[in-house]
Amino acid sequence: MVTALSLLTACGGNPKTTAEAEKIDYTVEQFADLQILRYRVPGFEDLSLKQKELVYYLTEAALQGRDILFDQNGKYNLTIRRMLEAVYTGYKGDKNTPDFKAMEVYLKRVWFSNGIHHHYGSEKFVPGFTPEFFRQAVQSVDAATLPLAEGQTVNNCARKCSPLFSTPR
């Protein structure tokens, strides 16, 4: 993704006026100790179709590299991320509860840091939701969306993964 952004920023294009640049809200989201920012990419709309296609494929390659990075950062990072994503998208309970909101923040931290450890300090994230909530939430989603090993049950997977991110070490 960094490569794709570098290519886009090198495109040039018509510079925007200061007033136009100030109209954009650069902060997309803020949670925990993180802030997600958006950037204007001047000239993107002026790229040829071939250049936009290149940007697309570079972005797809970056997404595949992200999974490799997750896997290299911790043995169970990819499994945990996929379980959390399955709950985030398929949870059938109340998404306004403090446990679900805490799980959402935890997932976003996992996305940002490519795993269950802080991207700078390397300390393990402590989730704000209970292991009971996690097990119940995992059981509420479609099993086909979970990263189950061959022959593994939903209960077994939830029981195996819960201590991996809910214990301090």
Where are these regions (language model features)?
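Sec-dependent signal peptide recognition
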Residues: 1-2
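Bacterial signal peptide processing site
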Residues: 12-14
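N-terminal helix-rich structural modules
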Residues: 22-169
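N- or domain-start disorder-to-order transition segments that initiate the globular core
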Residues: 17-20
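C-terminal motif of bacterial Sec signal peptides marking the signal peptidase cleavage site
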Residues: 6-10
